[in-house]
Swiss-Prot record:
Its EC number is 3.4.11.5. The lineage of its organism: Bacteria, Pseudomonadati, Pseudomonadota, Betaproteobacteria, Neisseriales. The keyword Cytoplasm applies. It is found in: Cytoplasm. The gene is pip. The keyword Hydrolase applies. This is Proline iminopeptidase. Keywords: Aminopeptidase, Cytoplasm, Hydrolase, Protease. Coiled coil: none annotated.
Amino acid sequence: MYEIKQPFHSGYLQVSEIHQIYWEESGNPDGVPVIFLHGGPGAGASPECRGFFNPDVFRIVIIDQRGCGRSHPYACAEDNTTWDLVADIEKVREMLGIGKWLVFGGSWGSTLSLAYAQTHPERVKGLVLRGIFLCRPSETAWLNEAGGVSRIYPEQWQKFVAPIAENRRNRLIEAYHGLLFHQDEEVCLSAAKAWADWESYLIRFEPEGVDEDAYASLAIARLENHYFVNGGWLQGDKAILNNIGKIRHIPTVIVQGRYDLCTPMQSAWELSKAFPEAELRVVQAGHCAFDPPLADALVQAVEDILPRLL
């Protein structure tokens, strides 16, 4: 990965009556524009995310999506849908005077990248995607319902289901929704910590749990749950695989960890079958973008796609 340079431009953009989103630019002000779309939903971006891009070559734009990271209000699910986020990306592009850009996203960021590209294909130079997640019921059930990845970490699964009454464990995502949006803040925070702790075990091969406090877990837990309960607003004619025809001309590289427990390779495989023009690169790695095999593969993907953007 590249040296992490400080932003040369940053601020907040009012995108609705409620929401302000954080944005920043780093790298070369005259370089090839790229936007980094973080995962979650609700994870927020970190300075390390700049490191996937050569700062001498790229004008690196990073945003924190509604309700998370440095954006305000924190952990707010109101006026917070996939299509709100797509509109926000366009507002940032217009504000910065960028015509077209490379779009880079992993996990939920891959979902949002695809949704944005299918809505505004004329604004996308290329796509670099990692850990494909299409926000389908089968994928959210794999993560947060019994019988999926729960079979890999049964001991941690018991901790995840512990806050839920036994008679409600057949629909865990819905049951957690009631806790994460409960009027009692202590109930919300306890549920958020359990949700985020569970996910942390799926991201790395040697997980250590979530080391931040419960409040720091609230955005990712609440917003993930909010999006999962609503199917990501990507059903029917909005489903990503039903709209591949809109983006088949866009240069695309998919980087997928073979042993990814959060976003298993099945989704990347299905996307590559529907989108044969995209290049699928399978890495002997898990989910975390910063683990060396994946990080190296992502840096290489960006370098390889660059000539097709110029």
